[in-house]
Amino acid sequence: MNVSYRKLFEILKKKDISKSQLKEVLDLSSATLAKLSKNEQVSMTTLIAICNYLNCQPGDIMELEHKIDKDTLLYRLKEEKKAKLKGSIYHQTQIKLAYNSNHIEGSRLTEDQTRYIYETNTIGLEKEPASIDDIMETINHFQCFDYMIDCANNTLDEEFIKTTHKILKTNTSDSRLPWFNVGEYKSRRNMVADRQTTPPGKVKKEMDKLLNEYLGKQNISFDDILDFHVKFERIHPFQDGNGRTGRIIMFKECLKYNIVPFIIEDNLKMFYYRGLKEWDNEKGYLRDTCLTARSE
């Protein structure tokens, strides 16, 4: 696994900070600066010092680049995406994930309509009229999936999370509301069923804490990914679109760590909600639901 500091140098450029300034302010050695420039490993102490200086997280300045493993699902999805193979795993997953993830959130499009939109890039409505938002969010979800595949091996960070939300909600009626903040954290309180979520003013701090806690784990397991999802949903960082953004994140992290991903279909929706609610008391509810979804 190789390390890349491309994102660090992008931040420095945006902040108009030169390498020599960084070296001087943090008292870095020339050898350390050279390692950063050549994408070589540096100490965690150095990374923390840089993050504190730039007010960011480790995932904001570095990413791990995996060697290509042609036996993984991710490699196959990337190849099928590139080749635009009809009927492939990539093709079917695009349709099933978009349909089911949107359906959980109230979309009234059928799976056949979702398939038609994906395969023809047109809208085929024979009976009932469809919501423009349902159509836009379906199209946007296809783009979210492509973005997720392209970024799957990157370290999970705030940029990926916010960009996913921005893609999902672009050109929807929500995006035209001045307070909605597409691709940014919420500005108004929201709720999940009867549960209070994190107040807008505390979202940034709680998301930073969640990401740092998650990225600090030595080996990411299936339960770690589920735990992140539960905590993400409880924070509910965006005004709307949290569930779909959260499920894209889960799919990404499963691909990154070569864990078989899953799609929550309608018959498992209530079990999924129960699992989210009862995670602190019984992790088996959500774990078993997701494992069942994986086998369907």
Regions found by a protein language model. Give the residues of each.
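Recognition helix of helix-turn-helix/homeodomain-like DNA-binding domains
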Residues: 27-42
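Key DNA-contact positions within bacterial/archaeal DNA-binding proteins
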Residues: 20, 31, 59
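DNA major-groove recognition helix of helix-turn-helix
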Residues: 26, 37, 54, 62-65
